[in-house]
């Protein structure tokens, strides 16, 4: 049996580290099979030497985040554990990030993974950014947050959000309703992100003034967009022609963020994805950068990753070999 002791400089450290009902330390205990004891101004970790060493690294990293003003929760505790398990515990302090903006409910919007932090920093420092990766990695939400931040700081005068109105198994011409009613469901995720950060009333006022626009990609044709923060979502469903059209809308003092998941292409068979092609064609141009997310950047409920892994495992078992 091996013991590790950590002394706290302030009681607030212990309170923040352990969390409500010691939930953060329960996660550490379950992950490493150790025992964590709270002794007020100190704590002890007991167990096998190797497991205690890993748990101690995780705890020390979490204390560093607390000292930088971060609040701990299940999500960042589990992410810190994953970094420790990969031997990347020295990168934990870099998770502490400045707040991008505050939602209407008072919640700070911050990057939650190293991949997200790289994405936000890349958007800050470049004119055109491609964010490519699986669903749940915060590609669109963080891009909208950066757009709202730039708009509030008067760095741009407009926010423009767009996506192609192409989804699996549905054709707009066969859906009931007028054009606005038809395209609204496809744009709903963009509306939701803006409502979250601006509130429905403020969003509506900005939309009426023309300072915020949410529209299908086809509406971008023939325009030059100056002083704008422009986001193209679900870009894997653009054709090469649409992508070229969109990117060449860039005007002076504007920024473009393009997001998509190249594993979820809903284009008809035989159609190339404009996103896949653009990333290849533009990779050597300065001020155009691609950030790639992985499943480690998924920030949804922890069960989502378990569900994805279970389906992948099931799929591998049930793939019939070709004769």
Describe each PLM feature range.
Residues 13-30:
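Short amphipathic alpha-helix segments
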Residues 29-37:
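A short, structured beta-strand/loop element
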Residues 8-10, 38-40, 47, 163, ...:
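Flexible glycine-/small-residue-rich
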Residues 1-16:
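Short glycine-/aliphatic-rich beta-strand segments at the starts of folded cytosolic domains
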Residues 104-116, 122-232, 236-323:
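Conserved helicase motor core of SF1/SF2 NTP-dependent helicases
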Residues 37-96:
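Interdomain "pre-motor" coupling segment immediately N-terminal to P-loop NTPase/helicase cores
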């Amino acid at each position: 049996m091996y013991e590790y002791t950590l002394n706290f400089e302030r009681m607030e450290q212990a309170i923040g580290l352990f969390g409500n009902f010691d939930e953060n330390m329960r996660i550490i205990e379950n992950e490493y099979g150790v025992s964590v004891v709270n002794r007020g101004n100190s704590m002890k970790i007991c167990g096998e030497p190797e497991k205690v060493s890993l748990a101690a690294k995780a705890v020390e990293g979490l204390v560093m985040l607390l000292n930088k003003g971060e609040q701990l929760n299940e999500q960042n505790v589990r992410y810190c554990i994953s970094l420790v398990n990969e031997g990347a515990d020295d990168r934990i302090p870099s998770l502490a990030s400045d707040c991008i903006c505050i939602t209407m409910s008072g919640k700070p919007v911050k990057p939650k993974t190293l991949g997200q932090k790289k994405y936000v920093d890349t958007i800050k420092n470049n004119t055109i950014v491609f964010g490519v990766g699986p669903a749940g990695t915060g590609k669109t939400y963080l891009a909208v947050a950066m757009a709202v931040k730039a708009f509030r700081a008067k760095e741009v005068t407009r926010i423009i959000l767009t996506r192609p109105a192409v989804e699996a198994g549905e054709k707009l011409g066969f859906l009931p309703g007028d054009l606005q009613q038809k395209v609204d469901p496809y744009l709903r995720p963009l509306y939701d992100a803006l409502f979250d950060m601006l509130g429905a009333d403020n969003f509506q006022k900005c939309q009426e003034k023309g300072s915020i626009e949410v529209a299908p990609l086809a509406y971008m044709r023939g325009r030059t967009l100056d002083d704008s923060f422009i986001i193209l979502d679900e870009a894997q469903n653009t054709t090469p022609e649409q992508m070229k059209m969109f990117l060449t809308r860039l005007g002076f003092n504007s920024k473009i963020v393009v997001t998509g998941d190249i594993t979820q292409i809903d284009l008809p068979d035989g159609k190339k994805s404009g996103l896949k092609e653009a990333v290849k064609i533009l990779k050597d141009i300065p001020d155009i950068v691609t950030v790639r997310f992985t499943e480690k950047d998924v920030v949804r409920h922890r069960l989502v990753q378990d569900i994805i892994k279970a389906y992948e495992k099931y799929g591998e078992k049930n793939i019939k070999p070709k004769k």
